[in-house]
């Protein structure tokens, strides 16, 4: 159920980390 949300969160974090 929270798989999609978890993936979305991971992608958001990864994007933020890359932007840094």
UniProtKB/Swiss-Prot annotation:
Catalysed reaction equations from the record: (E)-cinnamyl alcohol + NADP(+) = (E)-cinnamaldehyde + NADPH + H(+); (E)-coniferol + NADP(+) = (E)-coniferaldehyde + NADPH + H(+); (E)-sinapyl alcohol + NADP(+) = (E)-sinapaldehyde + NADPH + H(+); (E)-4-coumaroyl alcohol + NADP(+) = (E)-4-coumaraldehyde + NADPH + H(+)
**Pathway(s) this gene product operates in, as recorded in its UniProt entry:** Aromatic compound metabolism; phenylpropanoid biosynthesis
CC cofactor: Zn(2+)
Manner of cofactor binding, per the entry note: Binds 2 Zn(2+) ions per subunit.
| Metal-binding among keywords | yes
What keywords does the record list, in alphabetical order? Lignin biosynthesis, Metal-binding, NADP, Oxidoreductase, Zinc
EC id: 1.1.1.195
Which GO molecular function annotations are given, in alphabetical order?
cinnamyl-alcohol dehydrogenase activity; coniferyl-alcohol dehydrogenase activity; metal ion binding
GO terms for biological process, alphabetical? lignin biosynthetic process
Q: What does this protein do?
A: Involved in lignin biosynthesis. Catalyzes the final step specific for the production of lignin monomers, like coniferyl alcohol, sinapyl alcohol and 4-coumaryl alcohol.
Instruction: Tell me the protein family, please.
Output: Belongs to the zinc-containing alcohol dehydrogenase family.
Q: What is this protein called?
A: Probable cinnamyl alcohol dehydrogenase 1
């Amino acid at each position: 159920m929270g798989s999609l949300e978890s993936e979305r969160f991971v992608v958001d974090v990864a994007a933020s980390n890359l932007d840094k």
